From Swiss-Prot:
Subcellular location: Cytoplasm
Keyword Cytoplasm: yes
Reactions catalysed: Hydrolysis of an N(4)-(acetyl-beta-D-glucosaminyl)asparagine residue in which the glucosamine residue may be further glycosylated, to yield a (substituted) N-acetyl-beta-D-glucosaminylamine and a peptide containing an aspartate residue
Gene name linked to the record: PNG1
Function summary: Specifically deglycosylates the denatured form of N-linked glycoproteins in the cytoplasm and assists their proteasome-mediated degradation. Cleaves the beta-aspartyl-glucosamine (GlcNAc) of the glycan and the amide side chain of Asn, converting Asn to Asp. Prefers proteins containing high-mannose over those bearing complex type oligosaccharides. Can recognize misfolded proteins in the endoplasmic reticulum that are exported to the cytosol to be destroyed and deglycosylate them, while it has no activity toward native proteins.
Database matches in InterPro entries: Papain-like_cys_pep_sf, PNGase, Transglutaminase-like
Family membership noted in the UniProt record: Belongs to the transglutaminase-like superfamily. PNGase family.
Protein's UniProt name: Peptide-N(4)-(N-acetyl-beta-glucosaminyl)asparagine amidase
Length: 348
């Protein structure tokens, strides 16, 4: 039996540590340094703008309701209920795996070239493409540009608006990486799952989901129906990358070390300590208003993630148990062969 005095001392040190952490987050961010960094570094400004959009846009209850009304919930939950369950906390992992399957196989489609709405032609019958500005109607749905093709069969113009409005994507149900990640992030949020939008500077995006069962952030890519395979980009696709940044409701974090296992591109557009400072400042701003207990919980989770991302850290038993096999399919699954080759994502 543990001597009560040791329990008392342990509780005292834990309380002091908790108070220390809480006070850290209550310290004001040096705004002069933030403003100077945003003025002098273009990349810092880009991250700041993305944080303003991506950290809050999916917190929309009306959108969540629209997603749940559109998806086949009976089918999704029936499939989840058939999956093996070691612990109640594993249920959300199974739900995410089923959402990945459902989204890729039953709901959303990949668009190499759009289908002609006039005659239904597709593939080699569709030629182009020029880039045009959106029409007034297309612009209503946060459309930045439109790919315009020509149908050889019926001589019609075929338009592929690159919509950024996830509710419009719920209607069109087609797109490429950006559209897939955009809507799937909203799908995860609609099911009450903690999720991040992961942005890669070399033109790819995916998600992460916080697993209560594994107690860590899990890589999730709806294009590939991939769960907990962070190695696929640098290993399987042979993709070269520089920065991977995660955005979510309560933070901005550099997760590059989780994904860039080889083919590291130079990281020279912002000083490393400036990037760390900016992420910390943006995270502090997002956590304004949290209770002391919530702030402490987030800090502890952040701390564990940094141990995971730090390659020099000694792995815990839990980390060793959760090691994943860095094998699998060579190259990317989604997209045409020509498109994947042009992006350096075909595994060669």
């Amino acid at each position: 039996m543990v001597d009560p005095i040791y329990v008392e001392v342990a509780d005292m040190f834990l309380k002091r540590y908790k108070d220390y952490v809480i006070n850290l987050f209550k310290e004001p961010v040096p705004l002069n340094r933030v403003q100077k960094l945003l003025q002098e570094n273009k990349f810092a400004g880009e991250l700041f703008d993305m944080s303003n959009r991506l950290c809050t846009m999916y917190e929309n209850g009306t959108w969540h309701s629209q997603v749940l009304e559109t998806l086949d919930l009976d089918k999704i939950y029936a499939n989840v209920d058939m999956m093996p369950l070691e612990d109640d906390s594993q249920y959300s992992d199974n739900l995410v795996k089923e959402l990945l399957r459902y989204f890729k196989q039953d709901f959303f489609t990949w668009c190499n070239k759009p289908v002609c709405k006039s005659c239904g032609a597709s593939g080699d019958d569709i030629n182009g493409a020029a880039i045009q500005a959106p029409t007034n109607e297309e612009a209503k749905f946060n459309c930045g540009s439109v790919e315009v093709y020509h149908c050889q069969k019926c001589n019609s113009e075929v338009r592929f608006p690159r919509y950024n409005d996830p509710i419009k994507l719920l209607e069109t149900r087609t797109g490429r990486c950006g559209e897939w990640c955009n809507l799937f992030t909203l799908v995860l949020k609609s099911f009450g799952l903690e999720s991040r939008y992961i942005w890669n500077r070399e033109d790819h995006v995916w998600c992460e989901y916080y697993s209560p069962y594994l107690k860590r952030w899990i890589h999730v890519d709806s294009c590939e129906q991939s769960f907990d395979e962070p190695f696929i980009y640098s290993k399987n696709w042979n993709k070269s990358m520089s920065y991977c940044i995660g955005f979510w409701r309560y933070g901005v974090v550099d997760v590059s070390k989780r994904y860039i296992l080889q083919n590291q591109l130079p990281r020279d557009i912002i000083k490393e300590d400036d990037l760390q400072f900016l992420c910390h400042a943006l995270t502090k701003r997002l956590r304004t208003g949290l209770s002391d207990d919530e702030s402490y919980k987030m800090y502890c989770r952040d701390d564990l993630e940094q141990l995971e991302l730090n390659p020099s850290a000694t792995p815990t038993k839990e980390m060793q148990k959760l090691k994943i096999s860095k094998t699998g399919n060579k190259g990317r699954i989604s997209g045409s062969a020509e498109w994947k080759e042009s992006r350096g994502e075909n595994g060669k």
